[in-house]
Amino acid sequence: VVTYHEETETFKIIDIKTSTNGWNDYAKKDENKQFQLLLYKQYFSEQYGIPLDKIEIEFFILKRKVLDADDENLMSPYQAYRVQQFIPPSGKIKLGRAKTAINDFINECFKSNGEIKESSYPKSPSKWNCNFCPYKEDKENCGEGISY
């Protein structure tokens, strides 16, 4: 979602995400999530000729599960809110790191003519990597047979 504030002449790019219970500190520090929104800011600036300092970014997180006020797992009244907002850092250094990350990915995965590079990528099984892998239960294609 992109909004425009006429008085300050600034744009805000809002990335709406869903989460079971909201984002913890680990999710907020996930650079891949931050880089996605930072790159939206960069490309929006390039496409429409808007200075970067006139573009703000924000995550708007919708919680799928909200605890009741009398739930014993409720640690704070703020935990019961259905939405959560997070504004990641978006200065020049962070934006530069996002651009470097996407360019490194493109250079590693694609040839200069746009074709996919054929390469061998070593398996790196871990709780996080295997959790999202489509082959996590496919011992024939994975070969690791690791289940978390």
Residue ranges: model-predicted function:
Residues 1-37, 45:
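Non-catalytic protein-protein interaction segments used by genome-maintenance enzymes to assemble
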Residues 42-148:
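Metal-dependent nuclease catalytic regions and adjoining charged, substrate-binding loops involved
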